[in-house]
Curated annotation (Swiss-Prot):
Subunit note: In plastids the minimal PEP RNA polymerase catalytic core is composed of four subunits: alpha, beta, beta', and beta''. When a (nuclear-encoded) sigma factor is associated with the core the holoenzyme is formed, which can initiate transcription.
Any single GO CC term annotated in Swiss-Prot or TrEMBL for this entry: mitochondrion
Region (Alpha N-terminal domain (alpha-NTD)): 1-461
Name of the molecule in the record: DNA-directed RNA polymerase subunit alpha
GO biological process, one term: DNA-templated transcription
Its job: DNA-dependent RNA polymerase catalyzes the transcription of DNA into RNA using the four ribonucleoside triphosphates as substrates.
Keyword field: Chloroplast, DNA-directed RNA polymerase, Nucleotidyltransferase, Plastid, Transcription, Transferase
Source taxonomy: Eukaryota, Viridiplantae, Chlorophyta, Ulvophyceae, OUU clade
Length: 577
């Protein structure tokens, strides 16, 4: 029996000790909960990318006290839709069109359709842009123009590189410049707007700055057939086509009429064409056409041999025709005149070969347009693009750009009970973006915009003569006093020499502004402020006309309120009557 009692007492002690330990730990937790502040957490519930221009995110924000969740959710929603900056195309210059309903030759879409497609392009940048930027587009067909063909600054890029712009045929050519700006919400143009004329002059002055000396296909599509017009700056002005000892010299006086300035001669041969593939610029420094020939490529050599055979047949036909009629030429015609005709025919055959010589193979080879001769047009490099400046129309088309990166925002308020059985609210926030920003980053930026909006309200002082009780602002009081003194001297005194000469007039003019201030600028507490207002004391001038006894006679205005009013007046160097 003794052993059983000991075991029971021992078990009772162990249970009691365990209970006390739990109680102490619960007290510690409760104390910690009282000391520790409550945190608002943002967690992602769901997110998905529907396509490159549609991001979706679902977030939980909270906990909040009852009533606070609705305030935060509504403020966040409005901030997301109106305060976030975006980048977009705002103004376009198009060569070859004067109005938006015109259609350029070789372009499937009208100018209006192209502008609408440019409006839908979503741009983003590595940082916020504070000044307008310029972009370029200069392409010729056949091919499809997409967002990746736009020549943009290095820090700006398209969210969806495959976004459609236009389609060009064989004879199609599209040249344009456009202005890129950063803003909020959206923009609508007014013809008399000064900002529109500033952007228009900026767009007219801008010129493309291209350092590359080789042709470029579309960046995003290897199989694209669009080449960009790139001006080349070479040191060598000599005109050499293919170099070899066995060459046939072709005089090209008629090429001068076409705008092709050949400085020396045009040389053509077989061996260097197939073996060395040594190709230099066919045109001089001021008028060059950007296309290259690449060596050691099997597919390219196959197309080269086919081209060479066709070209050789044309040459043999010309030779036979020349030898057959040589005697007739010498007898019946002037030799110089006959020579010009043959040269014209030769240059014409070279410049406008058969269509099959221009056929591009459907291959993944990025150099599939090598060895294909291109017709050179007269180039006016005083203009921004490779078009004849005199015969080309220029149109300027503003775009009602949409800068908002947020497409849609929804929120839902849910109430839950925490561990202490207290009701807490949480916000379920749904955000859809256009792909230029992640939904979570958008919420952070929207919250930051709200903080920057409300932060000045903590520091605002309608009366700069007052000194705040907060120690954080005491250091800036000396600067405030200096500003006030400078304001007295510069704004009031130097403006009128008569005021500066008369000190009484000086003081009277400056103090008059202070006396007209409302007593709310004294930052009194609620009790003295309400008593003074009920006594019809509205301005500081009314207040200093009272004595201490008069103020103490006001109902509910005691000694403590009097001391508070006197301290507030001392800060403004004023006293009661």
């Amino acid at each position: 029996m003794i052993k059983i009692i000991i075991k029971e007492t021992f078990s009772f002690k162990s249970v009691l000790m365990h209970f006390l330990k739990e109680k102490v730990s619960n007290n510690k937790i409760s104390k910690k909960n009282k000391i520790m502040p409550s945190y608002t957490l943002l967690s992602c519930i769901d997110s998905r990318v529907e396509n490159l221009t549609k991001f979706y995110g679902r977030f939980e924000l909270g906990p909040f006290a009852p009533g606070q969740a609705l305030t935060v959710a509504n403020a966040l929603r409005r901030s997301l839709l109106s305060q976030l900056p975006g980048t977009s195309i705002t103004l376009v210059e198009v060569r070859g069109a004067s109005n938006e309903y015109e259609i350029i030759t070789g372009v499937r879409e009208s100018i209006l359709d192209i502008l609408l497609n440019l409006k839908q392009i979503v741009l983003t940048s590595d940082f916020e842009i504070f000044s307008p930027q310029i972009g370029f587009l200069s392409v010729e067909g056949p091919g499809v123009i997409r967002a990746n063909d736009l020549k943009l600054p290095s820090f700006i890029y398209a969210v969806d590189p495959n976004q459609y712009i236009a389609t060009l045929s064989n004879s199609g050519r599209l040249n344009m410049k456009f202005l890129i700006c950063c803003g909020k919400n959206y923009i609508t143009y007014n013809p008399n707007d000064s900002q529109y004329f500033e952007w228009l002059s900026l767009l007219k002055k801008s010129k493309p700055l291209i350092k590359s000396n080789s042709p470029k296909l579309n960046k995003g599509n290897i199989n694209s057939e669009i080449d960009s017009d790139i001006s080349i700056d070479k040191k060598n002005d000599e005109v050499i086509f293919f170099q070899n000892a066995n060459t046939r010299v072709v005089d090209s006086q008629t090429a001068l009429k076409k705008g092709l300035v050949l400085k020396n001669t045009l040389r053509i041969n077989k061996s260097s064409f197939l073996i060395n593939s040594n190709y230099q610029s066919f045109f001089p420094k001021t008028q060059q056409k950007a296309f290259s020939i690449f060596r050691k490529n099997s597919k390219t050599f196959l197309s080269t041999m086919g081209f060479y055979k066709e070209w050789k047949k044309e040459r043999e036909f010309l030779k036979k025709d020349l030898y057959k009629n040589q005697e007739d030429f010498n007898k019946s015609y002037d030799f110089q005149e006959t020579k010009k005709k043959l040269q014209t025919k030769l240059i014409k055959n070279f410049e406008t070969p058969k269509k099959k010589l221009f056929k591009v193979q459907n291959s993944a080879n990025p150099f599939n347009k090598a060895f294909i001769p291109l017709t050179e047009e007269k180039v006016d490099y005083d203009s921004d693009f490779n078009l004849d400046h005199k015969s080309t129309k220029i149109g300027y088309f503003p775009i009602d750009a949409i800068f908002m990166p947020i497409n849609r925002v929804n929120y839902l308020i849910e109430s839950t009970e925490d561990i202490k059985l207290k009701i807490k609210d949480r916000v379920i926030l749904e955000v859809w973006t256009n792909g230029s920003i992640h939904p979570r980053h958008a919420i952070h930026k929207a919250a930051k915009a709200l903080i920057q909006l409300f932060l000045p309200l903590q520091q605002i002082r309608t009366n700069l003569f007052l000194i705040s009780d907060n120690s954080h602002f005491e250091e800036g009081q000396d600067k405030i006093k200096k500003r006030i003194d400078n304001f007295k001297k510069e704004a009031l005194l130097k403006a009128n020499p008569q005021i500066q000469a008369n000190p009484q007039l000086k003081k009277r003019n400056f103090d008059h502004r202070l006396l007209e201030l409302d007593i709310a600028n004294l930052e009194l507490t609620a009790r003295p402020y309400s008593c003074l207002k009920l006594a019809n004391i509205n301005t500081i001038e009314d207040l200093i006309s009272y004595s201490q006894e008069d103020l103490l006679s006001i109902k509910n205005f005691g000694r403590r309120s009097l001391i508070e009013v006197q301290k507030a007046l001392q800060l403004m160097k004023l006293t009661l009557k």
